[in-house]
Amino acid sequence: MTTSPGPVYETAATTDDAALTFRGVDHVSLTVTDLNVSARFYTEVLGFTVVLDFGYGLVCIHKTTGFTLSLIRHPDGTGTRFTQRQTGLDHLGLTARSRAELLGWEQRLRDLDVEFTPVRDSELGHHLNFRDPDGIALEFYAPNDRYAAALDELRSRKFSDEELLDAAEQLGLGAYVARRVS
């Protein structure tokens, strides 16, 4: 029996990658059922500060990372809890420095009565999963040393698509690596 390579994805052609790109994630907006409950969670549990209140939504900034999170309450929203099985967001992943830091977060979540799944190890690092009051899936992720080094190198210079795919294979994840159509 032969194993098939990972899925094949076609890479879109661009005329000038340097001129047409994005610099990072500006913000994430989450739809919530109760702005006050969600604001309390994101400020008390994760350390965000509410900086703008539009009535229907709040803009929160994390003072250490500068990450911007918007909490939106749609007046015609369904009021149902989040499920990652519906098309859209699966989870919001936040970076942690180490497995030890994840254990510290575990204790903080425990102290604040936030349900969580204990730290788990994966091929590329360690993760701690929990949910906000609307059931939105959140994750702290700490890359292992090998993956962290690969990420640092990726951030340090521009790579071709083929180099990125080769780097993914070198992480030992060959069966999961997407292949580009030539």
Residue ranges and their predicted role:
Residues T2-A18, G24-T33, T80-S182:
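Vicinal oxygen chelate
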Residues T14-A18, G77-T83:
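Short beta-strand/turn micro-motifs at beta-sheet edges
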Residues A19-F22, V45, Q86, D111-D113:
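Alpha-helix termination/capping residues and helix-transition junctions
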Residues A19-L20, L30-P75:
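Core segments of cupin and vicinal oxygen chelate
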Residues Y56, F67, G88-D90, L112:
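A generic structural signal for short beta-strands and their flanking turns/coil linkers
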Residues T68-L69, D76-T80, L112, D145-A149:
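A short local loop/turn or secondary-structure capping micro-motif enriched for an aromatic residue
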